[in-house]
Amino acid sequence: MRVAVVGSGPSGCYTAQSLVQQHPDVLVDVLDRLPCPYGLVRYGVAPDHEKIKSLQNNLRTVLEHERVRFLGGIEIGPGGVPAARLRELYHAVVYCVGAATDRHLGIPGEDLPGSWSATEFVSWYSAHPDSTADGFVIGARSAVVIGVGNVAVDVTRMLARGVTELSPTDMPDPALNALAASRVTEVHMVGRRGPSQARFTTKELRELGSLPDTEVTVSAAELALDPAYLDPSPLPAPQGRNVEVLRGWAAAEPRPVSRRISLRFFLRPVELLVDGGRVGAARFERTVPDGRGGVRGTGEFEEIEAQLVLRSVGYRGMPVEGLPFDAGSGTVPNVDGRVVRGGSAVPGEYVAGWIKRGPTGVIGTNRPDAKETVTSLLEDAPTLVQKDLRDDPLDALRAAGAEPVEWAGWCAIERAEAELGASLGRGVVKLPDWQALMNAVHGSAS
């Protein structure tokens, strides 16, 4: 049985792993639009999170399995291999394409110069080859990060990091140099609800307090608006730990430092204000708990100076060519991973990961999610294998115009990144664009 897995991030790799573990004869091709595997583990995990990035080694083991083949540089859909053609070449196709875009605030001024999504910022400092944005910190003294999840914590931390801490990472040189020259000394991370409802995890939160020459401040008055802050005993343990960390910062005495991170709560963004043709401040309405788990506006407003605004209010799935799509949830309709068309599950087409369930959970959540989808696929296998597939799909993919980057090509990229880092007196440094990546694949020094 031949199966195509579209996407080589955690959900794609765990799907491939589950397939070869549960079926003795399955052959899995893991296809990716990029020439590099690992998805958000490579292009979403903060460069200073080496322990999480080391998950690449686990995913690497999957992609090096004798019955798994990595094929990068293959676009599925418009401009690439049609989804219908892919379906003809394999007994089954599993889409693990994640949530490719970010949510917007929907407020005036959101499109001003100096206002960006956290996704754009992360892509820049992670050397995603599609990233064309730069100049994030140029001219900025104060930054506002809207959102209180782990991505918001990541970008806040990156803005407060110094060159000494960033140099040992694989961050590309242009981003490293820009952040080293940054004049940002104030970072405000803002949530519209209270601390007990924040999405960040305690480990990531505590990291903010360990940054050199940086102070974290929290308003005790804002924290006290949250009923669960006053009495955290009913809270689940993770939220309770967060509250205790915040309580400690709120009680701390001010100290002389070069940078400050201010954690703000119960502030709803209503407008980004212009100053000299770019963002100059963010305007918020104060909120209070509404007694039903949400918040309501108070009619009181506050402006926070900011020459840089990063929104981090969630990811969103995008339609996949040839598949049904639920615009409300940003997912492909499915039952246990089987794609649903016209109210009925369709054997042969499957989804796993964020495009299946929405952008929730941590990296490890994708393992049981993938296993559920693979269980559905293998239940359908007796019907699926009746299709006669004698030829290797690789030839047909090339005939369709694809130029696959096989595992040897990815290994060439890894070698080039190690050589680049050595030439700069650093460790491994990511190649920053498509041309550099493809030059490495083809052995070109140009």
Ranges and model annotations:
Residues 26-30, 157-296, 377, 381-385:
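Dinucleotide-binding/catalytic capping subdomain of oxidoreductase cores
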Residues 3-24, 153-159:
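N-terminal Rossmann-like FAD-binding beta1-loop-alpha1 element of flavoenzymes
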Residues 35-92, 243-258, 262:
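N-terminal Rossmann-like dinucleotide/flavin-binding domain of flavoprotein oxidoreductases
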Residues 114-132, 272, 278, 290-357:
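FAD-site-proximal beta/loop scaffold in flavoenzymes
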Residues 102-181, 330-340:
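Glycine-rich dinucleotide-binding loop and its adjacent helix/turn
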Residues 338-342, 346-446:
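C-terminal, flexible cofactor-proximal segment of oxidoreductases
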Residues 87-92, 139, 298-307:
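Core beta-strand elements of the Rossmann-like FAD/NAD(P) dinucleotide-binding domain
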